[in-house]
Amino acid sequence: MNSQDEIHLLLQTFQDGYIRRDLTQVDTFMQLFSDDAEVIGTNGVAPGVEEWYRDRASARELVVGDWEGWGDLRIDLDAMSVRHRGDVGWVAAPATVTKIIGEDNYASFLDFVKHLLDDSKLSPEQKLLHILRGGTNTVYELRRGEKFVWALRFTAVVVREANGWKFAQMNFSFPTIYFPDVRLME
């Protein structure tokens, strides 16, 4: 099997794990990553903060969280771009995350509001702005239907180790046409 096919097999194995989402197999699944793999989830803002993991052991938290409740990840393996030079390769692919949302999202948002109101770090104005934005988004999205499909970009760097190709870096990102959700304030 050539390197291109081996990298495709790594991606197929990754996709299969996300399809099954068997939490009893998460440690075996994590063997797809190098020990020092860096994994950046959609909530990753800075190294070591939120969903920006600096090694395989900590990246396990992202995988478990995804498998428990993120949604149905589907990487378009037919449209992915795979390149490699020697023992290093890089991958880019369109993907989707599909989740069925429903009336329980109203209650979930209200639970968020309760916790937000107790947050002493935010000013009353900031709390109100978060409530207004989140409430509007919740109503808007639920009125559009219960099937919610996010477009996603999946990129990764892979390296060939003694026991095969492994993920050395991975990034999940959402395209956006409006203001991004995270804004750094000076």
Q: Predicted segments — roles?
A:
Residues 90, 104-132, 136-142, 146-183:
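Short beta-strand edge/turn micro-motifs at domain boundaries
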Residues 3-25:
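Short, aromatic-enriched amphipathic alpha-helices that serve as compact interaction elements
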